[in-house]
Amino acid sequence: MPKERVLNIVDICTPQRIGFRNFPDTSPHDTTKALRKVEALDFDRIVPGHGPASAPKAEVTAIREYLEDLTRAVSAAKEKTGNQFAVDQITELVKADLRPKYGQWGEFDNWMMMNVDRILLEQRLGY
């Protein structure tokens, strides 16, 4: 809705909630790139499809930053454990790292393991 400066954006940006990252075609790497393109668009508010009826543009940036922070935290935890397949241990380290900034977001504890697992998969595939 250009006149209203509102962007309808579903599934890749749910304000204040970490994403459900377990669909076969989910790619945090590609989502991060897409969110950067969305951030460059001229709009003020989003209609996310999940969560609140609308939210400010800043929520797009917050989700992108979460994905970048998640990727960094997974890499650090993987290095610390020395085992890319220690998903439980890596997830606990990532939760501890990200909890101060994102711990109040919806599904933080419930969906973090699938977020970590998806980042690990992408790293194994060379993203």
What residues fall within each predicted segment?
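Metallo-beta-lactamase
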Residues: 1-69, 76
